[in-house]
Curated annotation (Swiss-Prot):
Belongs to the CsrA/RsmA family. Coiled coil: none annotated. GO terms for cellular component: cytosol. One of its GO terms (molecular function) is mRNA 5'-UTR binding. Keywords: Activator, Cytoplasm, Repressor, RNA-binding, Translation regulation. Controls extracellular enzymes, N-(3-oxohexanoyl)-L-homoserine lactone, and pathogenicity. Repressor of virulence factors. A key translational regulator that binds mRNA to regulate translation initiation and/or mRNA stability. Mediates global changes in gene expression, shifting from rapid growth to stress survival by linking envelope stress, the stringent response and the catabolite repression systems. Usually binds in the 5'-UTR; binding at or near the Shine-Dalgarno sequence prevents ribosome-binding, repressing translation, binding elsewhere in the 5'-UTR can activate translation and/or stabilize the mRNA. Its function is antagonized by small RNA(s). SUPFAM superfamilies: CsrA-like (SSF117130). Homodimer; the beta-strands of each monomer intercalate to form a hydrophobic core, while the alpha-helices form wings that extend away from the core. HAMAP family: CsrA. This is Translational regulator CsrA. It is found in: Cytoplasm. One of its GO terms (biological process) is negative regulation of translational initiation. InterPro entries: CsrA, CsrA_sf.
Length: 61
């Protein structure tokens, strides 16, 4: 795992098209902004896990 330190307003770049910017820090919460192409899905981890769980459940008709 790569660990980086960023201050509010600073950005990191992932690949050629994804940027992640630190928008604010309040207590133990960090607000981040993600710019990515429409074809790149961006989810919070808990939402992604829920999507994956729903995909693995058999569909009933």
């Amino acid at each position: 795992m790569l660990i980086l330190t960023r201050r509010v307003g600073e950005t990191l770049i992932i690949g050629d098209e994804v940027t992640v910017t630190v928008l604010g820090v309040k207590g133990n919460q960090v607000r981040i902004g993600v710019n990515a192409p429409k074809e790149v899905s961006v989810h919070r981890e808990e939402i992604y896990q829920r999507i994956q769980a729903e995909k693995s459940q058999p569909t009933s008709y």
